[in-house]
Amino acid sequence: MGKLRVMSLFSGIGAFEAALRNIGVGYELVGFSEIDKYAVKSFCAIHNVDEQLNFGDVSKIDKKKLPEFDLLVGGSPCQSFSVAGHRKGFEDTRGTLFFQYVETLKEKQPKFFVFENVKGLINHDKGNTLNVMAEAFSEVGYRIDLELLNSKFFNVPQNRERLYIIGIREDLIKNEEWSLDFKRKDILQKGKQRLVELDIKSFNFRWTAQSAATKRLKDLLEEYVDEKYYLNEDKTNSLIKELSTSRLNENLTVEQVGNINPSGNGMNGNVYNSSGLSPTITTNKGEGLKIAVEYSRKSGLGRELAVSHTLSASDWRGLNRNQKQNAVVEVRPVLTPERGEKRQNGRRFKDDGEPAFTVNTIDRHGVAVGEYPKYRIRRLTPLECFRLQAFDDEDFEKAFAAGISNSQLYKQTGNSITVTVLESIFKELIHTYINKESE
């Protein structure tokens, strides 16, 4: 086999393509399908391809007229199968888009496919949704294996668990019964046990072991962040005071440290420990997660506190009650300890490494006598959200240079797939199956 020919559906900004690029696979993109005009611009900028390669609305594509390809990648819109999307499944037109993916497999019969979707798909409609999908893959001639993979185990500080399905055309591999671990009681094992009873065509893919999370959210935060990403201190003052009387944990977990809503409730007001993981980022109107950062007296710098929630795509502009998921608490050294809002020569904060004013008996410039560290709350930046999905900084810069707004950049990362997870899948698929098939 020469270059691996790839067709991409529901392409977004091209996480599959970024993964193939990163592991050095020589591939040819024969086409992609994306209806969001901003995602198309980002995709073309990041992967240096012409918009003419975009086939547009997948439901309007004549599948028989598509060019030949070896690998089909993509994940149909997941909102109809997720809790956040009210789980309407195939009753939602977004759910029926799955069958456009299957029709493409049926008409073009590529050798391999990789499909991604939300964890909730497994037990949606009491498992019937997964049953229908697996049967559809079998009916069009593919043996499959599936696994739940969490981004936090793939060098990314984001707790993002997604379902991945690998398919190989049945004439290329013998049928293998799944090696089920009956000691595992998770929903995936239960789902696979159901599929065994349906006589699904299967094989055993060697998935990367998910051992331990290694990165903290603070490891990917930008050093210098524009003031526009910070929340109004009037809205965060009560939480800041509360945090100042406690010590944040260093556990590699998703830890909510507080809520900035007046009621103290609502996911949109949650603030998370940046020494841990991010929760899953999503497409929640294009805004960034809020996190907490502790000021270190020893270094004089903001000390970020571990894994991010799943990325969401919320609006970057001023946070309303629906736009507060992705913000960060950061500490800034103030010029005066007793009044954070007081200014000295028109400035509010001292620069990093700048010497303190001379201490005298009149003023106590920069001297925090008996006081706790200062915290601030801000949203994650679009670049930080790109990093949470394991895209290169250069990928972000290309999309930004293409004129994509912050709001759209947030949405695009929330809609995307973690690149390092896909890298692990492609490494095994290429090493064990694609290279072997070409011998």
Curated annotation (Swiss-Prot):
One BP annotation, GO: methylation
EC number(s) given by UniProt: 2.1.1.37
Keyword Methyltransferase set for record: yes
Pfam families in UniProt: DNA_methylase (PF00145)
Domain annotation SAM-dependent MTase C5-type: ranges: 4-436
Gene3D superfamilies: DNA Methylase, subunit A, domain 2, Vaccinia Virus protein VP39
Annotated CDD domains: Cyt_C5_DNA_methylase
Top-level taxonomic group: Viruses
Role this protein plays: Modification confers resistance against restriction enzymes that recognize these sequences.
Subunit relationships: Monomer.
Family label: Belongs to the class I-like SAM-binding methyltransferase superfamily. C5-methyltransferase family.
Protein name according to UniProt: Orphan methyltransferase M.SPRI
Species assigned in the record: Bacillus phage SPR
Lineage summary: Viruses, Duplodnaviria, Heunggongvirae, Uroviricota, Caudoviricetes
